[in-house]
């Protein structure tokens, strides 16, 4: 929704100014009636606007999907607002004591009333109201759904309305009088998180739900004018003919706030205000302090007692003070740029990831989507960073091997579907549910035990078509039974090809048998009337050697990272790949070793002449194979080749710097300049070499 935020962000400034006006009465010295009509009526849209922002950006997604990440966002918001409220209480504590809002002589119940509902200073009610309202709406959404939540919140607002601007009327009804007497024993006003906040949070949620369909409309403008004029007449009537207890709530205020918010979503001003949310939050918190200061100064400068001038001065000073604090925050904040890893790191190329995915998309059918296989820490490249980049280019389905990997990916903020390819013990079923993961059913027994747990979970059914590793027996009767289990929501079915990386005749025959068996199972299930969900059987080599296949997904692993597993095995379809990872380490010290001396562990490396030796801060614990010791590994620095000498140690390695120019301590060297060549020389595959890269290596995404 970032493309719709410009109008909202700019209006935050106007709304914050309106709040200042409500607390300063700018027209008091000129025409008090204008304060009644404008300040205490029209400007009342300001606070609902801020609550609607919370509903739109925080609870909108939650109302559609109670995922782990959406729930975490709510928890973080509540914690943040709670801390802001605490700091604000401390800031205004002396003034709260002076004006009697709180007193050390108050009993516990009265203090709770002040802290939970009223706020310890007149503007601080907003923060507990936001917390209570958010908790209430979240619980209602979870238990009764959005429509009933709106209805319930509307009823709460109407109750609150009767204790606010309409109190002069409702107070005449004995039963209602008793109700409001009880309510006011707990809160000075009905403008609170119980009666006021929920309806505006719901309106923000509604705006989120309709925002994609929203278009600019003159009808919205007309409706806004109708409702704002109607609310003005409502206010005039209530102020003139009734005893208004407060004027925060009007019958037409929700309608005005909703139409205004929808108009702002369509408004795309060129002017953009940086950090408008933080700026206006600080203005809201600080402006009463500025009011006190300006009021004190006005005793010595009488002209400042002019209400309009007083208001303008408070607004200007509040924004200046808020901006100064933001500037200070930037200076104190740790630089957003990652601190360079002084020891060793992996540099991940975002552009290479994009390139590789684009090349893959050229090969697969247009209707086939990509699953990003990010197991084993994205083949050693950095699971969180790679998945983040894949999400940016439209990949929203990810595969991992274990539930621990899946949870780590979800906790990183990943919003996509996450399929666990491997076995997960049924005792972890609560975690599968909690983190909204998709579990592979890897055997008949696995499926039966998971179903007996009586906790509904999302699943994909893995079928053993000939790999003979994981998967249920390719018997359609058994598979049908899995689909009938009430607690297994099977959303897809898949298999794995055991020999798709080879074009030898025996490998082709095995692969074709697997594909034939898989297709037959799908056909039989279809004839049985079973909706089997998504289908996928190809991994990286499956798309290169069997591009004619057309299933819902392909599982892309090694190709995403810019490598083939084995460059000696030809593929039917060529592909232009760019390696996404560079392994770098720092030169941490150097020294001269005289001829005839041994270096490193053992006696395998003896220098024949006076040699300049350097120490590079990476070793076999970081994934560099120890078998590459003694000149089998070549590093690079600014295009120069540097030979590794001696045995590679756990945490470092030695290099010969005798022929290297312009290298200094702390310079970074490329440690594995040609991963595919090294894998070939070590008679392994690039998958293994990459997956060895250790967790001590930092990850830099560029």
From Swiss-Prot:
Domain of life: Bacteria
EC code(s) of this entry: 5.1.1.-
CC annotations in GO: cytosol; plasma membrane
Main location: membrane
Residues with N6-(pyridoxal phosphate)lysine modification: 375
Single GO term (MF): acyltransferase activity, transferring groups other than amino-acyl groups
Residues annotated as catalytic: 375, 601
Ranges facing Extracellular side: 34-39, 99-120, 164-191, 240-248, 298-307
Membrane topology: Multi-pass membrane protein
Topological domain spans for side Cytoplasmic: 1-12, 61-77, 142, 213-218, 270-276, 329-702
Residues that, per the record, bind substrate: 469, 650
NCBIfam families: alr, vanT-CELN
Protein name per UniProt: Amino-acid racemase
Organism: Enterococcus faecalis (Streptococcus faecalis)
């Amino acid at each position: 929704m970032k493309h719709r935020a410009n109008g909202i962000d700019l209006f935050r400034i106007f709304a914050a100014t309106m709040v200042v006006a409500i607390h300063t009465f700018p027209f008091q010295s000129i025409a008090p009636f204008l304060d009644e009509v404008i300040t205490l009526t029209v400007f009342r849209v300001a606070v609902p606007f801020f609550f609607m922002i919370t509903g739109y950006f925080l609870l909108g997604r939650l109302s559609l999907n109670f995922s782990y990440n959406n729930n975490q966002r709510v928890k973080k918001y509540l914690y943040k607002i709670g801390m802001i409220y605490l700091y604000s209480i401390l800031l205004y504590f002396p003034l709260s004591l002076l004006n009697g809002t709180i007193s050390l002589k108050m009993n516990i119940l009265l203090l709770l009333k002040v802290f939970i509902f009223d706020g310890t200073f007149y503007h601080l009610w907003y923060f507990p109201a936001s917390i209570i309202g958010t908790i209430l709406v979240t619980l209602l959404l979870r238990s009764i759904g959005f429509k009933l939540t709106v209805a319930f919140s509307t009823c709460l607002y109407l109750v609150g309305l009767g204790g606010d601007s309409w109190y002069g009327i409702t107070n005449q009804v004995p039963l209602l009088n008793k109700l409001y007497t009880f309510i006011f024993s707990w809160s000075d006003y009905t403008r609170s998180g119980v009666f006021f906040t929920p309806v505006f949070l719901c309106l923000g949620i509604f705006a989120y739900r309709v925002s994609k369909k929203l278009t600019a409309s003159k009808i919205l403008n007309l409706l806004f004018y109708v409702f704002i004029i109607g609310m003005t007449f409502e206010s005039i009537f209530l102020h003139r003919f009734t005893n208004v207890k407060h004027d925060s709530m009007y019958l037409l205020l929700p309608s005005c706030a909703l139409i205004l918010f929808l108009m702002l979503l369509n408004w795309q001003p060129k002017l953009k205000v940086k950090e408008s949310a933080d700026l206006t939050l600080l203005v809201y918190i600080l402006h009463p302090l500025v009011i006190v200061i300006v009021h004190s100064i006005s005793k010595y400068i009488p002209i400042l007692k002019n209400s309009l001038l007083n208001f303008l001065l408070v607004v200007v000073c509040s924004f200046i003070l808020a901006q100064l604090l933001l500037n200070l925050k930037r200076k104190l904040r740790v630089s957003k740029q990652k601190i360079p890893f002084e020891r060793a790191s992996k540099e991940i190329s975002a552009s290479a990831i994009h390139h590789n995915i684009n090349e893959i998309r050229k090969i697969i059918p247009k209707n086939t989507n990509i699953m990003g296989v990010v197991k084993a820490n994205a083949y050693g490249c950095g699971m969180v960073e790679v998945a983040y980049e894949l999400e940016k280019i439209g990949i929203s389905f990810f595969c991992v091997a274990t539930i621990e990997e899946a949870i780590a990916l979800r906790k990183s903020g990943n919003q996509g579907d996450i399929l666990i390819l491997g076995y997960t013990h049924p005792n972890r079923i609560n975690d599968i549910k909690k983190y909204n993961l998709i579990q592979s059913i890897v055997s008949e027994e696995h499926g039966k035990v998971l179903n007996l747990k009586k906790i509904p979970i999302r699943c994909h059914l893995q079928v053993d078509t000939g790999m003979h590793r994981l998967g249920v027996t390719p018997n359609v009767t058994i598979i049908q039974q899995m689909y009938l289990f009430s607690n297994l929501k099977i959303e897809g079915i898949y298999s794995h090809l055991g020999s798709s990386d080879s074009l030898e005749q025996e490998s082709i025959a095995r692969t074709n048998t697997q594909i034939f068996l898989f297709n037959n199972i799908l056909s039989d299930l279809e004839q049985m009337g079973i909706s089997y969900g998504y289908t996928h059987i190809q991994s990286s080599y499956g798309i290169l050697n069997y591009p004619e296949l057309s299933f819902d997904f392909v599982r892309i692993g090694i190709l995403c990272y810019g490598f083939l597993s084995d460059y000696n095995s030809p593929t039917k379809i060529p592909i232009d790949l760019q390696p996404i990872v560079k392994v770098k380490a720092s030169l941490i010290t150097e020294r001269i070793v005289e001829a005839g001396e041994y270096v490193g562990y053992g006696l395998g490396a003896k220098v024949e002449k006076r040699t300049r030796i350097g120490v590079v801060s990476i070793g076999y614990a970081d994934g560099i194979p120890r078998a590459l010791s003694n000149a089998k590994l070549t590093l690079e620095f600014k295009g120069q080749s540097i030979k590794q000498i001696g045995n590679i140690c756990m945490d470092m390695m030695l290099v010969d710097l005798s022929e290297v120019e312009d290298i200094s301590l702390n310079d970074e060297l490329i440690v594995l300049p040609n991963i595919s060549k090294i894998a070939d020389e070590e008679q392994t595959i690039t998958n293994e070499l990459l997956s060895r890269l250790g967790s001590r290596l930092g990850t830099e995404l560029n």
